[in-house]
């Protein structure tokens, strides 16, 4: 009779290899492009604390990204000072996000209005937020036809500012779908141009 289906398994993580991978990526992009290292879910099992510490010491990344506020708080507790985006800011976590100098990903109107209200109550001024746009992944993100509404909401407050905009390229790793990827990029470019004409502050 089998007493257990579990076997002892050990994964050895070469942190220098992660850093070298980032260097390879950075070598193929313009210098003005900033790099985000996604360390959510314990850095996908590699150890978020160890990975973040190492990457902050060696450089090469401009931001870390985590899934929820608690992950970002833990990195701050460990002394990580690099900017951190929270990709799924939970209701009720907004004050903790701001007190820990984390930056929320905002992907719908309800979330935008809620975070602005929290930022105003907190006394924030031009607090950095990131806007995600749906260009074809159809999970989360503002649609292109919401640009004017987003701008109207932002024009009514000084509590937040847009730090960056981004999208999720759904099939970028499939060369046969390059046309779809280019359409996604074209949509994001249209959104970017409209936002740059209207917003008073630069963004990524």
Description of each model-found segment:
Residues 2-5, 9-17, 33-203:
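Active-site-proximal beta-alpha core segment in soluble small-molecule metabolic enzymes
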Residues 21-23:
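Alpha-helical scaffold segments that flank or form the walls of functional sites
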Residues 28:
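Conserved PLP-enzyme active-site core in the AAT-like
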